[in-house]
Amino acid sequence: TIDASQRLGYANRSTEQDTKDKGLSAEVNWQMDALGGASLTSITAYRDWTSLNAMDADFSGADLIFRDADPKGHSTAFETFSQELRLTGTSGRVDWMIGAFWADETLDRYDQYQVGAHYEPYLSTLVGSQVLAGLAAQLAPMNISVNTANPALFFSQVSGRPYGTGFIGGGSQDYYQQKARSLALFTNNTWHATDQFDLTLGLRYTHDRK
């Protein structure tokens, strides 16, 4: 049988989730009589997205590993700006369009783990229970005693640090940033050969840099 209690997860640290998404887009169209009635379209857009995620990473009743909901703790931020210009018009039997597109994006990612108050006694017990007995046997001929009664004190004994101070402020933090820029030039042209036959030619060139 399956013990349902083994399916339980615990959260003794904050599980705050804070996501913000905002953006702005504007489209402007100009009729250009000087170019035979051609139309110029400008589309400008900006977007900003951030997400903070706190969690109890060990999911146990002990305070072992956690993540803070801090901008430089465990977060993702995405910012992008784009600009597109299109010029469209008609010359005789040809409907033509030329355009350009530019985008600038930045992605920031902080990935942090911190150790909790129970990390040291947990790890000490895990390691100490395996090595203390053997260590005591090896040191006994030299009249060096080892406290095997409480494995939770293992790291403080071997390091000489006061109990509970060995991993204060410890953990890991990674920071990643990706920048991307994209430039594109494009055209789309339709030749109305007859009332029943059209020929369309399109071309696009894109250059991405990350």
Give the role of each language-model region.
Residues 1-99, 103-111, 127-132, 136-145, ...:
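Outer-membrane beta-barrel domain signature, strongest for Gram-negative TonB-dependent receptors
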Residues 97-210:
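Signature of Gram-negative outer-membrane beta-barrel scaffolds
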